[in-house]
């Protein structure tokens, strides 16, 4: 990590946040979250700042999520830094969600986990032909956090549940079709659009509207009927049964993906989306997600998931437990239960 992991700059009425860890696919750290929080706080009350942009400096990914290798090391050392990261990250998500000034995130390249958490709260979200959007956390023993309980549960039909359980990747056209993105631009147009916004930040919305392009056809519409029918249940056992009863290759592929995921994480994710959809305030959703993450990072699955896919890279995690029917409803309820008052998450500033 260096002082330049995130570049914070303001000029001519525009606040710029540029992620700058290309070798790590711009994975987020606690320090990066703290810097973004400080900048947004300052710019929100500065009358000279008309708009805020979020992008990345270079490379094939906007943001691959939180730096799970650092989280792994923190949990191994039992130094408490992992939980501190999530506390700060969720405050950053909430601050961007409640921001009153126009903001735009350029979702060019990989947008996963914490990257989605940076992008989704922004008023404008620009996808490109290189966008690869996913919430793959159930595959490493976690759950689709950073506001996933809010925005996944509000996607059409059962697309959010499908994404949470399979880690499915969406392209830029899919993101636009689902309102995960508000605009679609070819990658080659981004530099000119950013230049125009830099010169006229007060005209951000008009600049994006004029520059937007028509994406190629989205394939997500072709899958809607299958997704809504086969992922209709809120119990993972019922979803698996529906997929097993279907004879299509697509259903078999979804079963294969779900089989790779941590059973506890899958059950948590489905319940998270049920409860997240019922939240009337984003802060309530984030408080729920902090309760979840504070429990899940202490369970063996997260350590095992990172070991299998990041550290040893044998791609063979041994989940505990290994089967869905071994995860009890009492265990899930305990994961969602309130924390002691002094340990609860709270937003910065307004709710």
Predicted region positions:
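Conserved CoA-thioester-binding segment of acyl-CoA-metabolizing enzymes
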Residues: 1-55, 80, 94, 347-351
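Hydrophobic/aromatic residues within transmembrane alpha-helices
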Residues: 54, 67, 118-119, 174-175, ...
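Glycine- (often His-adjacent) and acidic-residue-rich active-site loop
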Residues: 56-91, 139-141, 335
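Glycine-rich beta-to-alpha active-site loop
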Residues: 96-140, 162-168, 172
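Gly/Pro- and small hydrophobic-enriched strand-loop and loop-to-helix capping segments
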Residues: 122-144, 179-194
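Hydrophobic, secondary-structure "cap" segments at the distal end of domains
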Residues: 149-158
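Amphipathic alpha-helical blocks and their helix-capping loop/short-beta junctions
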Residues: 180-261
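C-terminal amphipathic alpha-helical interaction region
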Residues: 292, 300, 304-351
């Amino acid at each position: 990590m260096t002082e330049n992991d995130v570049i914070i700059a303001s000029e001519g009425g525009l606040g710029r946040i540029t992620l700058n860890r290309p070798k790590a696919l711009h994975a987020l750290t606690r320090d990066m979250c703290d810097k973004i929080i400080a900048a947004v706080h300052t710019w929100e009350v500065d009358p000279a700042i008309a708009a805020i942009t979020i992008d990345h400096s270079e490379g094939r990914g906007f943001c691959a999520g939180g730096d799970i290798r650092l989280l792994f090391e923190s949990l191994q050392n039992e130094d408490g830094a992992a939980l501190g990261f999530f506390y700060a990250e969720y405050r950053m998500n909430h601050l961007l969600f409640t921001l009153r000034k126009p903001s735009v995130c350029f979702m060019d390249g990989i947008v996963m986990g914490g990257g989605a958490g940076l992008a989704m709260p922004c008023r404008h979200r620009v996808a490109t032909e290189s966008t690869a959007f996913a919430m793959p956390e159930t595959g490493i023993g976690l759950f689709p956090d950073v506001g996933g309980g809010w925005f996944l549960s509000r996607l059409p039909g059962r697309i959010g549940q499908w994404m949470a359980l399979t880690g499915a990747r969406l392209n830029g056209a899919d993101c636009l079709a689902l309102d995960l993105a508000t605009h679609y631009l070819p990658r080659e147009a981004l530099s000119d659009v950013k230049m125009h916004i830099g010169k006229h930040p007060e005209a951000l919305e008009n600049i994006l509207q004029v520059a937007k392009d028509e994406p190629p056809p989205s394939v997500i519409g072709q899958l809607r009927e299958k997704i809504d029918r086969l992922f209709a249940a809120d119990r993972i056992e019922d979803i698996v049964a529906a997929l097993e009863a279907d004879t299509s290759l697509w259903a078999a592929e979804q079963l294969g993906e779900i089989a790779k995921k941590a059973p506890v994480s899958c059950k948590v994710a489905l319940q998270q989306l049920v409860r997240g959809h019922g939240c009337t305030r984003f802060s309530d959703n984030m408080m729920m997600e902090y309760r979840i993450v504070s429990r899940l990072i202490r369970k063996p699955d997260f350590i095992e998931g990172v070991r299998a896919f990041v550290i040893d890279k044998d791609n063979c995690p041994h989940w505990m437990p290994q089967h869905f029917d071994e995860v009890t409803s009492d265990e899930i309820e305990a994961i969602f239960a309130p924390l002691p008052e002094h340990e609860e998450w709270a937003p910065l500033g307004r709710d």
